UniProtKB/Swiss-Prot annotation:
Biological process, per Gene Ontology: response to arsenic-containing substance
The protein, known as: Arsenical resistance operon repressor
Organism: Staphylococcus xylosus
InterPro entries named in the record: ArsR-like_HTH (IPR011991), ArsR_HTH (IPR018334), HTH_ArsR_DNA-bd_dom (IPR001845), HTH_MetalResp_TranReg (IPR051081), WH-like_DNA-bd_sf (IPR036388), WH_DNA-bd_sf (IPR036390)
Free-text function comment from the UniProt entry: Transcriptional repressor for the ars operon. ArsR is a trans-acting regulatory protein which controls its own expression. The repressive effect of ArsR is alleviated by oxyions of +III oxidation state of arsenic, antimony, and bismuth, as well as arsenate (As(V)).
Keyword 4Fe-4S: no
Domain named HTH arsR-type: residues: 1-92
DNA-binding region: 32-51
Pfam families attached to this UniProt entry: HTH_5
Molecular functions per Gene Ontology: DNA binding; DNA-binding transcription factor activity
Cystine pairs: none
Keywords associated with the record: Arsenical resistance, DNA-binding, Plasmid, Repressor, Transcription, Transcription regulation
């Protein structure tokens, strides 16, 4: 994952409501109406947040009759965590490996 891609995901995650939606979905699949009951915002606002989460692969969606069901995309969230771990280590993939320190 590139820095630009990771930055885009982190921007999506920087919204407190979206983080709370992910937390609610950590308990399992929920429909939009269940999510909406938890928040004090309108259905269009929820739709905006869900579109962002789905478009960025953090959440998956499926239709169940006339309901939209949402669940966490655990595989992609694990992938994001792996990429954040790379930034937090000094392994071979680290950008600092090509730097010569103390030669300014």
């Amino acid at each position: 994952m590139s820095y630009k891609e990771l930055s885009t995901i982190l921007k999506v995650l920087s919204d407190p409501s979206r983080l709370e939606i992910l937390d609610l979905l950590s308990c399992g699949e929920l429909c939009a109406c269940d999510l909406l009951e938890h928040f004090q915002f309108s259905q269009p606002t929820l739709s905006h947040h869900m579109k962002s989460l789905v478009d960025n692969e953090l959440v998956t969606t499926r239709k169940n009759g006339n309901k939209h069901m949402y669940q966490l995309n655990h595989e992609f969230l694990d992938y994001i965590n792996q990429n954040l771990d790379i930034i937090n280590t000094s392994d071979q993939g680290c950008a600092c490996k090509n730097m010569k320190s103390g030669e300014c």
